[in-house]
């Protein structure tokens, strides 16, 4: 407790923003220029002397920039009285103005951060808080951000009943930006895509869903698939490690020291075929499983198999024209390499050793210009037959249409 001139005292519990009710207070901390002022009237008994305080003034000094001043009149005579009280009010943070204090002598008010003592009690006028100057510590915790609510709209990408709302921020550093929210049919609010995915579960696939626009973006799904396809960790999974670069010695050194490599065959090199590594493993000569199967048309009539040229002859055990046809057809569709057949002449002696697995089971053949000319003639004949069939179909349809028109005209005349 600190004494002040004029008979007032400053209470230690008031130094943090309380005001004694017996006087007027004006003051504030380093962030407040000036608080409120007030006067009070109340009887102030003095022990042993039956007198009332005539006039008292208090000046309070605390941990604030400006001290409080106060004065009160309470009757006749001379004497000193004390007025103690606590200021009550609402505010945020330390050092904000408070008002509406009450004390022993009555009601009083003052600025938060000031304290004063004097005689009497009364009601002090309330003053509006002064804005904080530049360089101050601020008014305390920040309040809610001002926003402008948008209109809730239906979201066609989500199940029926889901609403989308876009709220625009009106204050702060991010003024002008917008936040997107989604509302379920029951009224539950969702602020992010993970929350939406956890709530919907497997009911809706949100992999290509754009949270801001509320639409399904197929390009987003393609990017995710492409990223997974180009992921080096995904590519190296299940593949042999053929990296021949030397590792770095794991020693405590600031310089990278490679490991010395010793080999008995310095000229050896590891050959790699990236195309072969990307191919899926398959059974050798799997075309033999198609043996004995035949295709049929819509009328369940077996389609006659095509005849191979005389230059194509099968090779190997158990080879026939049907197996050779399926082998050549699969090689044409699944491989981009040229088809040459089994070129090695030793394949007839020992097929298990000299057989080329990347070529169909047929002898080596040579395509001549005569073969190409015959094939072109066959193609022209087939195209001519197709043209004749299409023209006949068009004429038959036109005739049917004319008959229908004649029947309708005769019905109208009747």
UniProtKB/Swiss-Prot annotation:
SMART domains: MBD. Residues 98-123 have a biased composition (Gly residues). The modification Phosphoserine is found at residues 184, 410. Coiled coil: none annotated. One of its GO terms (cellular component) is histone deacetylase complex. Highly expressed in brain, heart, kidney, lung, skeletal muscle, spleen and testis. Detected at lower levels in embryonic stem cells. Heterodimer with MBD3 (via N-terminus). Component of the MeCP1 complex that contains HDAC1 and HDAC2. Component of the nucleosome remodeling and deacetylase (NuRD) repressor complex, composed of core proteins MTA1, MTA2, MTA3, RBBP4, RBBP7, HDAC1, HDAC2, MBD2, MBD3, and peripherally associated proteins CDK2AP1, CDK2AP2, GATAD2A, GATAD2B, CHD3, CHD4 and CHD5. The exact stoichiometry of the NuRD complex is unknown, and some subunits such as MBD2 and MBD3, GATAD2A and GATAD2B, and CHD3, CHD4 and CHD5 define mutually exclusive NuRD complexes. Interacts with CDK2AP1. Interacts with DHX9. This is Methyl-CpG-binding domain protein 2. It comes from Mus musculus (Mouse). The lineage of its organism: Eukaryota, Metazoa, Chordata, Craniata, Vertebrata.
């Amino acid at each position: 407790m600190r004494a002040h001139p004029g008979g007032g005292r400053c209470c230690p519990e008031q130094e943090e923003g309380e005001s004694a009710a017996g006087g007027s207070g004006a003051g504030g901390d380093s962030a407040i220029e000036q608080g409120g002022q007030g006067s009070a009237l109340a009887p102030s008994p003095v022990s042993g002397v039956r007198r009332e305080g005539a006039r008292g003034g208090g000046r309070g000094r605390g941990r604030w920039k400006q001290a409080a001043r106060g004065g009160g009149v309470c009757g006749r005579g001379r004497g000193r009285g004390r007025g103690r009280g606590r200021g009550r009010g609402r505010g945020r943070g330390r050092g904000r103005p408070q008002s509406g204090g009450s004390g022993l002598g009555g009601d009083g008010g003052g600025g938060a951060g000031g304290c004063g003592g004097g005689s009497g009690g009364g009601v002090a006028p309330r003053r509006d808080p002064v804005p904080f100057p530049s360089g101050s510590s601020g008014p305390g915790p920040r309040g809610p951000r001002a926003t402008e609510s948008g209109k809730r709209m239906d979201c066609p990408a989500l199940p029926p009943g889901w609403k989308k709302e876009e709220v625009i921020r009106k204050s702060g550093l991010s003024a002008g930006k917008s936040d997107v929210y989604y509302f379920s049919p029951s009224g539950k609010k969702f602020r992010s895509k993970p929350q939406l995915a956890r709530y919907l579960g497997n009911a809706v696939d949100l992999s290509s869903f754009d949270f801001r626009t509320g639409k399904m973006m197929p390009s987003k799904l393609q990017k995710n698939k492409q990223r997974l396809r180009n992921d080096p960790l995904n590519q190296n999974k299940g593949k042999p490690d053929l990296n021949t670069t030397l590792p770095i010695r794991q020693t405590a050194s600031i310089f990278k020291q490679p490991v010395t490599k010793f080999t008995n065959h310095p000229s050896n090199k590891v050959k790699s075929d990236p195309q072969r590594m990307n191919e899926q493993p398959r059974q050798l000569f799997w075309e033999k499983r198609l043996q004995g199967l035949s295709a049929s048309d819509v009328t369940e009539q077996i389609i006659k198999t095509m005849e191979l040229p005389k230059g194509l002859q099968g090779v190997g055990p158990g080879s026939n024209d049907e197996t050779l046809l399926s082998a050549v057809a699969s090689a044409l569709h699944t491989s981009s390499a040229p088809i040459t057949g089994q070129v090695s002449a030793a394949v007839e002696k020992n097929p298990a050793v000299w057989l080329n697995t990347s070529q169909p089971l047929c002898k080596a053949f040579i395509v001549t210009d005569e073969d190409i000319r015959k094939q072109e003639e066959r193609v022209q004949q087939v195209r001519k037959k197709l043209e004749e069939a299409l023209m006949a179909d068009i004429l038959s349809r036109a005739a049917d249409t004319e008959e229908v028109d004649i029947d309708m005209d005769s019905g109208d005349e009747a």
